[in-house]
């Protein structure tokens, strides 16, 4: 639709320009500087020119930068409740839509939060589970209580308890096999292993040793790993399943001496 524009130029450098469509031109000029709120195609603007020749616009109505022909224009756009103020400087465009920016930030935070929670979404589980990625990754400096030792039973001299009844692919399943089945097959989730081991007569303390089982109650199901070695500086090398890479995947890591002091060890 063809636009008709009229302008009144003041000697002080102030201009009022009314723009409307076709037969709405006259009415628009008489109503709110040419802007007719009942006409979806109507818009108007006023502007001042400073001493440097820069234009400063105030717009109302339906408007888009492509509708204004300015050879030298740098527009900073600030959107507030549908009322648009624009400052025209020199060369190029800069857009600052605060509402959109805030929405983007919120969406991003929501995504990260949901992404983190997705690691904690568990389907129906049976006994003897290990930790998910998010829980096991927090198994650092866990405060534990030393469980009492009992009748001297140990992993190194124990007897095979039989079939592995833990859930395949979980940390408990791996550790049971790694110690040759010389522990109970019905100790439940990893979080329960220290207490179950103590009741069964195994030594449980906070001292790491090669061949022991490292255990923590951290997370929804706890976590267990097999101690491969203890280094001269006190750091502990462990192997484990379902730690950060999903069920069935065996990985290894080295834990510092200070971190290791926060875990239980079943001997």
Swiss-Prot record:
Residues 83-115 are annotated as: 7 X 3 AA repeats of Y-[NS]-N. Coiled coil: none annotated. It comes from the Bacteria. SUPFAM superfamilies: Cysteine proteinases. This is Staphylococcal secretory antigen ssaA2. Induction: More protein is secreted in a secG or double secG/secY2 mutant (at protein level). The keyword Phosphoprotein does not apply. The gene is ssaA2. It comes from Staphylococcus aureus (strain NCTC 8325 / PS 47). One of its GO terms (molecular function) is hydrolase activity.
């Amino acid at each position: 639709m063809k636009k008709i524009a009229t302008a009144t130029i003041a000697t002080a450098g102030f201009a009022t320009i009314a723009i409307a469509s076709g037969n709405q031109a006259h009415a628009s000029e008489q109503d709110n500087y040419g802007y007719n709120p009942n006409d979806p195609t109507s818009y108007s603007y006023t502007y001042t020119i400073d001493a440097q020749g820069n234009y400063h616009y105030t717009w109302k109505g339906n408007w888009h930068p492509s509708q204004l022909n300015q050879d030298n224009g740098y527009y900073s756009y600030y959107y507030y409740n549908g009322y648009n103020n624009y400052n025209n400087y020199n060369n190029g465009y800069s857009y600052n839509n605060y509402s959109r920016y805030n929405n983007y930030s919120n969406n991003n935070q929501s995504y990260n939060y949901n992404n983190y929670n997705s690691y904690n979404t568990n389907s129906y589980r049976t006994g003897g589970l290990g930790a998910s990625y998010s829980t096991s990754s927090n198994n650092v400096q866990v405060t534990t209580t030393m469980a009492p030792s009992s009748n001297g039973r140990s992993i190194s001299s124990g007897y095979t308890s039989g079939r592995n009844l833990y859930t395949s692919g979980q940390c408990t399943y791996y550790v049971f096999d790694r110690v040759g089945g010389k522990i109970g097959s019905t100790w439940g989730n990893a979080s329960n292993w220290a207490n179950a081991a103590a009741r069964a007569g195994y030594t449980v303390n906070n001292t790491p040793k090669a061949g022991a089982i490292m255990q923590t109650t951290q997370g929804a199901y706890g976590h267990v790993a097999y101690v491969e070695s203890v280094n001269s500086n006190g750091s502990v090398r462990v192997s484990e399943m379902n730690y950060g890479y999903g069920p069935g995947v065996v990985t290894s890591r080295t834990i510092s001496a200070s971190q290791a002091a926060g875990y239980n060890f079943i001997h």
